[in-house]
Amino acid sequence: MRLFGKRGADRVAVVGAGVMGLATAHALASDGRDVTVYEQFEVGHNRGSSHGATRIFRFAYPNEHWVRMAQEALPGWRALEEESGETLLELPGLLEFSTDPDKSSRDALDACGAPYELLEPADVEARFSVNVPPGMTALFQPDAGVVYAERAQRAFLRGAQGRGAKIEQGVRVDSIDDVDAEVVVVTGGAWAQQLLATAGIALPVVPTRETIAYFRLEGKPPSVVAEIANGHGFYALKDPVHGLKVGRHKAGPPTDPDLQAAPDPEIVTEIAKWTGERFQLAEPGPAAADTCLYTNTMDERFILERRGRVVIGSACSGHGFKFAPVVGARLAALATG
């Protein structure tokens, strides 16, 4: 099936209406472009990588590249808040646990001028009711917390539509050749690989199905990351329904995104054990569990580039959401430059 939009030099199609696709459409429409977004399910669906109430926002990364990108993203989120009239960020701070101070975010934060505190375990317990793992150091960074993910997607969507962008839901694009546009931006997440292959483009990513669990916890907990940079570390963040959302980074198996699967009970057990050991005020048993998709590159860096009339927007590896304002602007620039 060929998908026809208006003809003209500035016609751009975006395939995939997760947060990156919506951010790209918002940026393109803000620049006066003729934009059509194609989504195989519906905006806000639970089959991909963007669903759920919250995502971590943080400056704390061991690599300066990510710190600076997060610093660039923050004013983008604030501008979207002002435009939408909604609170999209809540920033009570983030605790980072690491076995090796030299592999923590300390040096990168210093290089980027971002504030932080190095805390003793007793200070962490007193301030946050969180236990520091034995043998680990604790770093607190205040420019962190959560992005309200569902609100953020709606804000990008409304802003794009208000500037003339069209959203075609329930339309699956099976081939780049089916899209009648001057430029096609592919932000299909775990489905991008198979779509790009139809244009002869090999995308070096591995989709995995990850498990998360929710726990009842009162108050505003800080976000927490523990050894994320060194492998399959744990992370936690506020959930507005249950209190706390917890996952184990990159612990899930490779998957076909067209298949659906239940949360992995073994991973839920591991998550529950970690949560019970760290969060003094969390109820011990999970209140719920869910899955999401990661689209992993070898080094967790994003693939944002143009090949002919195709722009590739693979910005995930399990940590992309916070960067959506930046990624959307960069993909829009690639599409129109």
Regions found by a protein language model. Name each.
Residues P62, V310-A324:
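Glycine-rich phosphate/pyrophosphate-binding beta-alpha loops
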Residues V15, Y38, V179-W191, L195, ...:
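Short hydrophobic core segments
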Residues F4-M20, T36:
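Beta1/beta-strand and adjacent pyrophosphate-binding region of the FAD-binding site
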Residues H26-S30, T87-L89, A190-R309:
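Active-site substrate-recognition segment that forms the wall
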Residues F140-D174:
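Helical element adjacent to the flavin cofactor pocket in flavoenzyme catalytic cores
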Residues A53-R127, G135-M136, G233-F234:
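Dinucleotide-binding Rossmann-like beta1-alpha1 core, especially the glycine-rich loop
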Residues P325-G337:
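Internal hydrophobic alpha-helix adjacent to the cofactor/substrate pocket in enzyme cavities
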Residues S30-S49:
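Glycine-rich FAD pyrophosphate-binding loop
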